[in-house]
Regions:
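Short beta-strand edge/turn micro-motifs at domain boundaries
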Residues: 123-148
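Flexible low-complexity loop/turn motifs enriched in small/helix-breaking residues
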Residues: 1-107, 111-121, 143-149
Length: 149
C-alpha cells in the first residue's frame, strides 16, 4: 500500500515485517569486522532482497538512515556470473524471509543471510515472539552450510 509520493500509508498486517526488521537490524549490528569489508574497502551499500516486494520497499525506507546505505539489491546486484557493482564498489546482498510458527501464533522464524559475489557468507535463523507491543529475539542459530550436500 504505497501512496503516489512513495511514502507508505499502510504495511500488511501479517506481523512479519516487524519480525524481519528486528532480525535484520540485529544481524546488521552484529556482522563481523571480517564480513564488513570487501578486500581493503568497506561496502558501498547493503542491498536488501525480500520476496515480498512491499516488505522489501518498507525495509529500505525504514532503514534509510543506516550507514552504509540500504538499497534495493535487485537494482545493483544480480545473481548472474557478472555481479553488478555500484560506483565501482561492491554491494553486500542481505536476504530476509519469514514464516509464522504453526505451533505458536505469536512466534515467527526469520532467515537472515548475506551473500557476496555468489558466495553465501552466512545465514542465521531467528526465532522471535511478539508480546503485543514489541518483538523479542528468543533464539539465534547459525546455519551450518558446510555439511549441506
Amino acid at each position: 500500500m504505497e501512496k503516489e509520493d512513495g511514502l507508505f500509508k499502510e504495511v500488511p498486517g501479517d506481523g512479519l515485517l516487524g519480525a524481519k526488521l528486528m532480525a535484520l537490524e540485529h544481524a546488521l549490528d552484529n556482522i563481523s569486522d571480517e564480513d564488513k569489508t570487501f578486500g581493503d574497502s568497506e561496502y558501498f551499500a547493503y542491498g536488501i532482497s525480500d520476496t515480498d516486494s512491499i516488505h522489501n520497499k518498507a525495509i529500505i525506507k525504514i532503514l534509510a538512515n543506516r550507514k552504509p546505505p540500504i538499497v534495493d539489491a535487485e537494482k545493483f546486484y544480480t545473481r548472474s556470473s557478472n555481479s553488478q557493482w555500484m560506483s565501482g564498489r561492491p554491494v553486500l546482498k542481505w536476504i530476509t524471509e519469514a514464516t509464522k510458527d504453526p505451533s505458536h501464533p505469536l512466534r515467527v522464524n526469520v532467515l537472515v543471510g548475506w551473500i557476496h559475489s555468489q558466495i553465501i557468507n552466512q545465514f542465521y535463523t531467528y526465532k522471535l515472539e511478539y508480546d503485543g507491543v514489541v518483538w523479542t529475539i528468543l533464539q539465534i542459530e547459525s546455519l551450518d552450510l558446510s555439511s549441506a550436500p
